[in-house]
């Protein structure tokens, strides 16, 4: 592993669920019940149900002004109309909670931004946090690579779950360059307008005091040149 891909020594988060988090509720049939915004997403409900427009209107928190300003822009309106129209036509789109990363990691708490490409496109995988999968799901190769790097660099133990919610609650913004994807169609929503939204988020974080940016893949690395030199920037293929 080249030096530029190594994790900073102070990145010592555990992959375990956050202390005190309640167990997932279940329906009488034994299936996981839908969770409130910001909560864990069951494999049964990880497909998009609520239109993007509704999720934008309902979003609260520090990111709300930025999100609403983007949604009112030409690029935002086009993207929302595109995704909502496909959803209404019956397309299966992931994840269910598109803005979950922003809900769990407010701007003022961001210490690390891990930027990926687009959500996992298989059933039960994407849960609104880049690289994270719900507990009990097999780990995709990208997640295994992240854990392997943390083991090698920091000696972190292998977590029991592929959920990275604990990281998000400790200031690690787990963001993809593109926030939605059609089932079994990688990169299907690339170039539709999400990149402009991601750029606004990165600009906001770039104005913060020192932050570590971990840019995973070429689409993410396109943002490297716009980052202030006071930040730590780590790039990985």
Positions of the model-derived regions?
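Extreme N-terminal basic, low-complexity initiation segments
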Residues: 1-12, 16
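C-terminal accessory regions appended to core domains
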Residues: 10, 46-51, 64
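Cationic, low-complexity basic patches in intrinsically disordered or flexible, solvent-exposed regions
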Residues: 17, 32, 116
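A polyanion-binding, active-site-adjacent surface
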Residues: 61-227, 232-237
């Amino acid at each position: 592993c080249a030096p530029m891909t190594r994790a900073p020594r102070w990145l010592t988060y555990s992959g375990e669920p956050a202390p005190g988090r309640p167990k997932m509720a279940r329906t009488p049939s034994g299936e996981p019940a839908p969770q409130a915004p910001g909560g864990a997403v069951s494999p049964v409900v990880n497909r998009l149900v609520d239109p993007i427009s509704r999720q934008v209107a309902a979003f609260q928190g520090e990111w709300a002004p930025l999100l609403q300003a983007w949604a009112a822009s030409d690029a935002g309106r086009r993207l929302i109309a595109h995704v909502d129209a496909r959803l209404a036509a019956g397309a299966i789109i992931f994840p269910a909670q598109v803005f979950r990363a922003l809900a769990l990691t407010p701007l003022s708490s961001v210490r690390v931004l891990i930027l990926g490409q687009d959500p996992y496109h298989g059933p039960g995988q994407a849960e609104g946090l880049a690289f994270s999968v719900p507990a009990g799901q097999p780990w995709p190769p990208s997640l295994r690579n992240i854990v392997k790097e943390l083991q090698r660099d920091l000696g972190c133990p292998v977590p029991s779950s592929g959920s990275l919610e604990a990281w998000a609650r400790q200031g690690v913004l787990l963001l993809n360059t593109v926030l939605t994807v059609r089932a079994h169609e990688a990169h299907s929503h690339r170039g539709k307008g999400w990149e402009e939204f991601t750029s606004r988020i990165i600009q906001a974080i770039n104005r913060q005091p020192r932050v570590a940016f971990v840019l995973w893949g070429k689409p993410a690395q396109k943002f490297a040149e716009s980052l202030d030199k006071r930040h730590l920037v780590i790039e990985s293929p």
